[in-house]
């Protein structure tokens, strides 16, 4: 039977087809480039360079012919436009960097290229990763492939939409407060935010340095494991990268996939697994359709042998104010470098250097970015640092401790990714607080630096996807992926595709 990309459901299938020479990397790249062109209305990509992509694909084919291929050689991937890429624009979704081209590759891009993966293009995103709906991009809003009148989630909305619509088999994303998990949930794909420090931030345009973390977005847990194998590892160029002596060792994140837990059977591969359900994740604010879908997924886990245990994360409601003090404070510092002098947007007319700074930043940044810079500058200012920033950091420590108390009672924590399914475009843009509340279940994981993922588990109102959130303890990605994979072996939610894909 001739190869057809339409029948592909995982990266493993693509890798096997490439290894068997059923399809070449160049043929595969041409297929996905054609899809990207046809689906331009989704606005998932900010930059596509077909010739550059095809050159990479031809090199992947040559590498395979020389017998130097890795498992992922020739497999296409899209990169969130927050990762700098030599020869491609790196805009962070902002007018400030609309025409910026980096002289070097981000470590994540470099490592995936070293594995032989082929870059399809750069995906749209909320400006400087500040947003939950991908409506804050200078390049326009991204549309959800399941319902093009709805948001795909943010800030990695372009990556989520691209994977969901079949425009790319996989994509990179970043997660500062939920920006891999929430769009994965809204778009019906699988995504994982690793432990903070697992994946290098070198070459990742910074929003909040103590929170930002890169990770993969794809269709299956196995896909994410294979991608994480390529992405993760210590990087001396990133001061926040975890060195081997502190746990940042290279490992095979796919090593437990398909294996029952110790002492478990094939029919109940998760026997002995204790799943913690935070009571704060199932209360006021959670829409009934999402709760029903998530609880159905939890019943499936019980059938796989797991036991459900109630736990408490008492500071969950404080995660929003804590995050929106710490993240804007760090953004205020990080974004001070964008002034139009060495790179980035520069105002056309100005009186002097100070006027040029002011006008360039006023013209280059969008409304949400300006709002967060102002909030961050305020909380760091004299007289307010102790009252806001220092207090927020203290509560952040308490939030991390709460997770450790919960993990004393369970092996993995589960719950909804978001309180609702994806909302309509424009529905929350006039109310920033309502937009921020959409991240209530993802922020605390980021504040604690824990690994978390979203796994498709059904559909809610409007036949829109719902994601189940899995949270593991530090460095527990392999077990987290094993737990997600077992669910996907027993269900087919991850195989569902939007009608137009």
Curated annotation (Swiss-Prot):
This protein's source sits in the domain of life called Bacteria
The answer to whether UniProt assigns keyword Lyase to this entry is no
The active site lies at 80 (charge relay system), 155 (charge relay system), 179 (acyl-ester intermediate)
The protein's GO terms of the molecular function aspect are: ATP binding; glutaminyl-tRNA synthase (glutamine-hydrolyzing) activity
Q: Name one GO biological process term.
A: translation
Q: Which reaction does it catalyse?
A: L-glutamyl-tRNA(Gln) + L-glutamine + ATP + H2O = L-glutaminyl-tRNA(Gln) + L-glutamate + ADP + phosphate + H(+)
Gene Ontology CC annotations of this record? glutamyl-tRNA(Gln) amidotransferase complex
What the entry lists under InterPro entries is as follows: Amidase (IPR000120), Amidase_CS (IPR020556), Amidase_dom (IPR023631), AS_sf (IPR036928), GatA (IPR004412), LisH (IPR006594)
Q: What PROSITE patterns does the entry give?
A: AMIDASES (PS00571)
Keywords for this entry?
A: ATP-binding, Ligase, Nucleotide-binding, Protein biosynthesis
Annotated SUPFAM superfamilies: Amidase signature (AS) enzymes
- EC nos: 6.3.5.7
EC top class named in words: ligase
Question: What does the record note on quaternary structure?
Answer: Heterotrimer of A, B and C subunits.
Give the family, as the similarity comment puts it. Belongs to the amidase family. GatA subfamily.
Function, in words: Allows the formation of correctly charged Gln-tRNA(Gln) through the transamidation of misacylated Glu-tRNA(Gln) in organisms which lack glutaminyl-tRNA synthetase. The reaction takes place in the presence of glutamine and ATP through an activated gamma-phospho-Glu-tRNA(Gln).
- List the protein's name: Glutamyl-tRNA(Gln) amidotransferase subunit A
Gene that this sequence comes from: gatA
